[in-house]
Amino acid sequence: MAPKGKKVAPAPLATKSAKSSESKNPLFESTPKNFGIGQSIQPKRNLSRFVKWPEYVRLQRQKKILSLRLKVPPSIAQFSQTLDKNTAAQAFKLLNKYRPETSAEKKERLTKEAAAIAEGKTAKDVSPKPVVVKYGLNHVVSLIENKKAKLVLIANDVDPIELVVFLPALCKKMGVPYAIVKGKARLGTLVHKKTSAVAALTEVNSADEAELSKLISTINANYIEKYEENRKHWGGGIMGSKANDKIAKKAKAAAAAVSTSN
């Protein structure tokens, strides 16, 4: 057995620091707080979960939680896989060049056309056919079916989702590039509306052809090429922390029971 270490000698001329003993006033009694029911005032906490929110907020929250908890079929789950931020910014930058005319611009164009017709010219001489973004669900579906659409953007938050749930399959069948983007409101601002479920490009100017082809190749890599793979993946099934803790506790108890029986 090894000998115990010797005590180190104190430093010479070392003065012991005198402990300052503060005299406590006997009049002031310590009153520890008790946060039980009906006792001390509770400390400030985040009580937002107890707030009675408006019905539309409650529905939003319930819908969000249910979409996480329940098993979601692949056809609906694919709408959670939206286009990444940088590619979406490029797509909207391109589509912004081809926004439809506003009511003021339309009035100005019609005035010019009327003046041209009065002079004996045709309307096409004054205003050639504009190249604009197409919108409206029925219109875009007919463009896809006729293979006229070059790029289709679908909103991920359309309600009811059944309106657009078939579009990815239709685009894949017709070989039309498509992407799922965040926000029907963002597509709506593109076409001067509050919301829009879909937007499509049928043609672009020759200056933007290279940019469009580059964008399509990026989008196809994320959607059309991964279509078969996405068809196999179900969504949801993500449980909350309390449920996960219960499952872990049961698994631990089962493992302990097996080890004791062995």
Curated annotation (Swiss-Prot):
Keywords: Cytoplasm, Ribonucleoprotein, Ribosomal protein. GO terms for cellular component: cytosolic large ribosomal subunit. Residues 1-36 are annotated as: Disordered. It holds the Pfam family Ribosomal_L7Ae. It is found in: Cytoplasm. InterPro entries: eL8/uL1-like (IPR050257), Ribosomal_eL30-like_sf (IPR029064), Ribosomal_eL8-like_CS (IPR004037), Ribosomal_eL8/eL30/eS12/Gad45 (IPR004038), Ribosomal_eL8/Nhp2 (IPR018492), Ribosomal_eL8_euk (IPR001921). One of its GO terms (biological process) is maturation of LSU-rRNA. GO terms for molecular function: RNA binding. Component of the large ribosomal subunit. Mature ribosomes consist of a small (40S) and a large (60S) subunit. The 40S subunit contains about 32 different proteins and 1 molecule of RNA (18S). The 60S subunit contains 45 different proteins and 3 molecules of RNA (25S, 5.8S and 5S). Belongs to the eukaryotic ribosomal protein eL8 family. Component of the ribosome, a large ribonucleoprotein complex responsible for the synthesis of proteins in the cell. The small ribosomal subunit (SSU) binds messenger RNAs (mRNAs) and translates the encoded message by selecting cognate aminoacyl-transfer RNA (tRNA) molecules. The large subunit (LSU) contains the ribosomal catalytic site termed the peptidyl transferase center (PTC), which catalyzes the formation of peptide bonds, thereby polymerizing the amino acids delivered by tRNAs into a polypeptide chain. PANTHER family: RIBOSOMAL PROTEIN L7AE FAMILY MEMBER (PTHR23105). This is Large ribosomal subunit protein eL8B. It comes from Candida albicans (strain SC5314 / ATCC MYA-2876). The lineage of its organism: Eukaryota, Fungi, Dikarya, Ascomycota, Saccharomycotina.
